[in-house]
A protein has these predicted regions:
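Hydrophobic alpha-helical segments of small multi-pass membrane proteins
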Residues: 129, 147-149, 172-179, 197
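Bacterial Sec-dependent N-terminal signal peptides
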Residues: 1-25
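Short glycine/proline- and aromatic-enriched beta-strand/turn motifs that initiate or cap beta-hairpins
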Residues: 21-94, 230-240
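Flexible, solvent-exposed loop segments that connect beta-strands
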Residues: 60-75, 99-124, 151-171, 203-224
Length: 240
C-alpha cells in the first residue's frame, strides 16, 4: 500500500511537472510572438513612399552688412514660397526643392529737379536636389528633414514713373537645410510646418544697361551674404 501511495504521488508530480513545462513553453512562445511584432510606426511597408509639397510663409535675411561698392541691403523680410517632391526608401530618401524669396520696397529718387518714387523688387530663386530623412512619431505625426546644395539666382528690378524698368541678376551656388513636422489628415493629404535656412553669397550683378554695368564693374568688388531663415506652412499630397 505504501509503495502504491508513493507511485501515485510520483505520477501526480510528473503530471504537474509536464503541465508546468507546457505552460512555460506557451508563455515563452507568446513572448517571442509579441517581441517579433514591429513597433507602431516602424513598419515601412505601411508608410507612404512619396509626395509632392507646396507651402508659403515668411523669409528673413539677418545680414544687412555693407560691402565695398554696394549699399547695405534693405531686403530684410519678404514672402517665401516653396514647391517640390520627396521620395523615400524606408527612412531615407531624396527630393527636389524649388523655393523663392520676394521682397518689395518703395524708395525715393531725386534727380536734382524733382523727387520720384520707385519700386525696388528683389527675388532670390533657389533650385536644388535634396537628401531627406523622416522619423515616424505615430499614425499621424512625422518629423522630417532635408539638406541640399544647388543653384541660387538673385534678381533685382527697379521700376519708376518716367524711368522705365531696370533689372540686374547674379548667380551663385548655395545650400539649404530644412526641418519640418507633418500632421496626416488622411492617406492622401498632410499639413506641414517647415523651418529652414538657405545660404549663399551673390557676386557682381549683370544689368541690362551698358553705362550702369561699367560703373558696377569698376566699383563692385565684394560679395553680399543673402543667407536667409524662413518659416512656411503647407501641404503634402501623397502620390505614391
Amino acid at each position: 500500500m505504501k509503495k502504491q501511495v508513493i507511485l501515485l504521488a510520483i505520477s501526480i508530480l510528473g503530471v504537474f511537472s509536464l503541465h508546468a513545462q507546457e505552460i512555460n513553453k506557451s508563455l515563452t512562445q507568446s513572448k517571442k510572438e509579441v517581441n517579433s511584432q514591429p513597433r507602431k510606426g516602424t513598419d515601412w511597408n505601411k508608410q507612404p513612399i512619396g509626395y509632392v509639397f507646396a507651402g508659403a510663409g515668411i523669409g528673413y535675411i539677418p545680414s544687412v552688412e555693407k560691402v565695398e561698392g554696394l549699399a547695405a541691403s534693405n531686403y530684410v523680410t519678404g514672402l517665401d514660397w516653396r514647391v517640390g517632391m520627396s521620395r523615400y526608401y524606408n527612412r531615407w530618401g531624396w527630393g527636389v526643392l524649388v523655393q523663392q524669396f520676394r521682397s518689395k520696397q518703395s524708395v525715393a529718387f531725386y534727380d536734382g529737379v524733382r523727387a520720384m518714387a520707385m519700386d525696388d523688387i528683389g527675388r532670390l530663386l533657389y533650385i536644388a536636389p535634396q537628401f531627406t530623412g523622416r522619423w515616424i512619431l505615430g499614425e499621424k505625426l512625422t518629423i522630417y528633414g532635408a539638406i541640399g546644395w544647388g543653384w541660387l539666382r538673385y534678381k533685382e528690378t527697379v521700376k519708376g514713373s518716367g524711368l522705365g524698368e531696370l533689372s540686374g541678376t547674379a548667380n551663385a551656388l548655395g545650400g539649404n537645410f530644412t526641418v519640418g513636422l507633418e500632421y496626416r489628415l488622411s492617406s492622401v493629404v498632410g499639413m506641414s510646418v517647415d523651418l529652414g535656412l538657405i545660404g549663399g553669397e551673390i557676386g557682381k550683378l549683370k544689368v541690362d544697361n551698358t553705362g550702369l554695368q561699367a560703373a558696377i564693374d569698376e566699383t563692385y568688388t565684394g560679395k553680399m551674404d543673402v543667407t536667409r531663415l524662413y518659416a512656411t506652412v503647407g501641404a503634402h499630397i501623397y502620390i505614391w
